[in-house]
C-alpha cells in the first residue's frame, strides 16, 4: 500500500472509531510502529488529527476541531430537529447566511420548499446540495478551501462577507462555556464574526453536547444572537447561565418550541 493510501485508510479508521492506537494501526496495515508514527505526524501536521498517548484521535479538544466527516455522524437526529426548527424561521423572499458547520448544514435539506430564497454560504456541502434547487439562488463565498471543514475561509471569504447584508444568519460553534461561544480555528472564528455582523437576525444552532466545553478562541457572547437553538437534551446546569443572563434559549424537541 502506498503511503498516501495508507494515510487515507488511517483517516477512514478514525472517522469510524474516533480514536486508534499505534499498535492496532500497525497490525491492521502490516507496517512498523515507527511507520505509523510518521503517518500520524504527517496527518497531524495537516491538521487532520491529533496525536495522543499511544495513538491518535479525531475527536475535538480545546485546540483541535474534528474533521467535518466525523462531525456529520454525531448527534444526527438532534441536529436534524434543530435544523427543521431553524427552517421554520425563514420566509420566502429572504436572504440567509449558513456557516460551515454540520449543524447549520442540515438546514439545506429543510428549505427546498421555501421559495424564492437567497442562500449565501461558505459551506461546500450546502452549495452542492442546493445548487440545483428550483427557486433558490445560491451565492457561494469564495476563498481558500479547507478539506477539514469542507468550507471556504481566508481573505477572499472575509472581504465578501464585509460587503453583504442579509436577513438571517445561522451559525454554530464547537464549544459553549457559560454565556460565550468558542472555536478552535482562528480563520473560522473570523468568518463567523463577520456573518454575525452581516445579518439583521442571527441564530446559534448547537447540539447539547457543545455546552460545558471551551476552545482556544473566543467567538462571541451569546447575547449577540436572537436565540440559541439546541436540543431538549441540554441539561438544566448548562441552560441556567443563559436563562439568568436573559439569553433566549430554545430547546427543540418533537413539539418544536417557537423561537
Task: Show the residue positions of the predicted features.
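HTH-adjacent hinge/linker in prokaryotic transcriptional regulators
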Residues: 2-23, 27-97, 101, 108-116, ...
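Gly/Ser/Thr-rich loops at beta-strand to alpha-helix junctions
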Residues: 102-104, 235
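Conserved phosphate- and dinucleotide-binding cores of soluble alpha/beta proteins
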Residues: 2-23, 30, 45, 127-259
Amino acid at each position: 500500500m502506498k503511503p498516501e493510501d495508507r494515510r487515507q485508510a488511517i483517516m477512514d479508521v478514525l472517522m469510524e472509531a474516533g480514536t486508534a492506537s499505534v499498535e492496532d494501526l500497525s497490525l491492521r496495515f502490516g507496517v512498523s510502529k515507527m511507520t505509523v508514527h510518521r503517518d500520524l505526524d504527517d496527518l497531524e501536521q495537516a491538521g487532520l488529527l491529533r496525536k495522543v498517548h499511544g495513538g491518535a484521535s479525531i475527536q475535538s479538544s480545546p485546540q483541535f476541531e474534528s474533521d467535518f466527516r466525523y462531525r456529520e455522524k454525531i448527534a444526527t437526529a438532534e441536529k436534524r430537529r434543530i435544523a427543521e426548527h431553524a427552517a421554520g424561521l425563514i420566509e420566502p423572499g429572504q436572504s440567509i447566511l449558513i456557516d460551515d458547520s454540520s449543524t447549520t448544514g442540515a438546514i439545506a435539506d429543510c428549505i427546498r420548499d421555501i421559495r424564492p430564497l437567497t442562500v449565501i454560504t461558505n459551506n461546500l456541502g450546502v452549495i452542492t446540495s442546493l445548487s440545483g434547487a428550483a427557486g433558490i439562488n445560491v451565492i457561494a463565498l469564495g476563498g481558500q478551501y479547507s478539506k477539514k471543514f469542507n468550507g471556504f475561509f481566508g481573505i477572499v471569504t472575509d472581504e465578501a462577507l464585509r460587503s453583504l447584508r442579509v436577513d438571517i444568519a445561522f451559525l454554530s460553534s464547537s464549544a459553549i462555556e457559560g454565556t460565550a461561544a468558542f472555536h478552535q480555528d482562528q480563520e473560522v472564528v473570523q468568518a463567523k464574526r463577520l456573518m454575525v455582523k452581516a445579518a439583521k437576525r442571527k441564530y446559534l444552532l448547537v447540539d447539547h453536547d457543545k455546552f460545558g466545553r471551551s476552545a482556544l478562541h473566543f467567538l462571541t457572547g451569546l447575547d449577540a444572537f436572537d436565540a440559541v437553538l439546541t436540543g431538549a437534551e441540554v441539561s438544566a446546569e448548562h441552560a441556567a447561565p443563559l436563562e439568568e443572563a436573559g439569553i433566549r434559549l430554545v430547546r427543540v424537541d418533537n413539539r418544536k418550541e417557537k423561537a
